[in-house]
A protein has these predicted regions:
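Catalytic activation segment of kinase domains across protein kinase-like and atypical kinase folds
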Residues: 61-70, 76, 106-148
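Repeat-unit-sized solenoid/scaffold elements
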Residues: 57-92, 180-188
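Conserved ATP-binding subdomain of kinase catalytic cores across diverse folds
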Residues: 1-70, 102
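Short, contiguous strand/loop micro-motifs
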Residues: 27-29, 83-84, 133
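Short intrinsically disordered coil segments
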Residues: 11-13, 83-87, 140
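A short, polar/proline- and glycine-enriched secondary-structure boundary/capping micro-motif
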Residues: 3-9, 79-80, 134-136
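C-lobe/activation-segment region of protein kinase-like
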Residues: 123-187
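Conserved kinase catalytic-core helix
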Residues: 35-52, 75-113
């Protein structure tokens, strides 16, 4: 729903301000705009080779945006994947995220529930909209979110080690600005 999205987007932008940068999350005026963006973002992820369920349709019903994605049989969200599997495959998540960033994309809402494991493959879902001209900040924010997702499961050292397989130390250090804000989010 667009109103809920607007409130959450405002909160994220306030968090970005508190981290010393301008807000970089876009908001949508209607539920349809919101799901059309997610449809397009999912298509773009797939075009660059990042696993994401194939988008089928986006529409509005009773004031709610509905995005229909391909069915992934027997998937687990990252919350339900064992710590051992996460530790073994954490570098893959950073490789996927790095691929987004290398192609001028960002996830913007990387949480455990937006990372799926299906048939041995990781998938990203629920990408949000960020300003195209803020690549450094959105990369740092995505990295902070990924580290916040992984750290409680595999520990800080293993999470950072996995991140170094895909990112330069200077890029990783830029994520520090967002760690306090990301820790405050109720979903991390």
């Amino acid at each position: 729903n667009a109103l809920v999205h607007a409130v959450l987007t405002t909160g994220r932008n306030v968090g970005a301000f508190s981290s010393g940068t301008e807000g970089f999350f876009d908001r949508f005026d209607t539920p349809r705009e919101m799901v059309e963006h997610e449809y397009e973002a999912t298509e773009r992820m797939r075009e660059i080779g990042v696993n994401a369920p194939r988008p089928i349709d986006a529409f509005e019903v009773n004031g709610l945006g509905v995005l229909v994605l391909e069915y992934l049989p027997e998937f687990e969200s990252l919350d339900d994947v064992s710590d051992a599997v996460i530790a073994d495959r954490a570098a893959e998540l950073f490789e996927m995220l790095s691929s987004l960033h290398e192609h001028g994309l960002a996830h913007g809402d990387l949480r455990a529930e937006n990372i799926l494991l299906s048939d041995g493959e990781f998938y990203f879902i629920d990408a949000t909209s960020v300003h195209d001209d803020r690549a450094d900040e959105t990369t740092a924010y995505d990295l902070a979110c990924a580290l916040a997702v992984l750290e409680p499961r595999i520990g800080p050292r293993k999470a950072v080690d996995a991140a170094t397989t895909a990112y330069a130390p200077s890029t990783l250090l830029s994520a520090r600005a967002f760690l306090d804000f990301v820790r405050l989010r109720p979903d991390h």
